[in-house]
Amino acid sequence: AKIDKVSLDVVFAAQTAWQILLAAESCNNLSRFDGVKYGYRTAEYKNIDELYVKSRTEAFSFLTKATIIYGSDVLAKDKYESCYDKSLRIRRIVLTKVKELLVSYDAILTPACSRLTFEPYDTKDAFTKVFDESLYTAVASITGLPAMVTGGVQLIADAFNESTLLSIAHSVEKEEA
């Protein structure tokens, strides 16, 4: 196997764009979990508004609530173009750059996270911690290309090349054994 060190200068842009797109899409997708048709339903409520608020308050974690609020913010009329729309454009740029690399290589191998072990942290710090660690997986998340983590590394391949990923992952795991 031929392995080269390459540079992917769009990683930091991918991380920020991924965070914005994740929040916006989560905000929209989680809006259906109102306790009426989908999701957890609180036991006690006086009216429909209270059902929505209490069901979501009881069911969603701090991180989920923070993501929904952030998503609402980036989808707001005054920020839509500068945040959400710009992130969609960045997504296309990142995908183009990654596909250019994948013309010459079967896969891209990257770290999956910044460290081997994690210390417990307060849930109030979760949003920042998750954002910091997303640097390593943001490219795969934002491009929609097939990716997998094995042996502490992430492998990213071109569309419809999952068999290549599995073959490389098998080789990585054999090397670890």
Residue ranges with predicted function:
Residues 11-13, 115-118:
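Short, active-site-adjacent cap segments at secondary-structure transitions
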Residues 18, 43, 47, 81-86, ...:
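Short, surface-exposed loop/helix-turn segments at secondary-structure junctions
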Residues 98, 127-147:
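Small-aliphatic-rich amphipathic alpha-helix that forms the alpha element of a beta-alpha
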Residues 1-27, 32, 36, 104:
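Gly/Ser-rich, acidic/histidine-flanked active-site/gating loops
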Residues 17-23, 125-126, 155-156:
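Short low-complexity, flexible loop/linker segments enriched in glycine and/or proline
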Residues 2, 32, 37-39, 66-96, ...:
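Structural helix-boundary/capping segments
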Residues 41-66:
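Glycine-rich phosphate/pyrophosphate-binding loop
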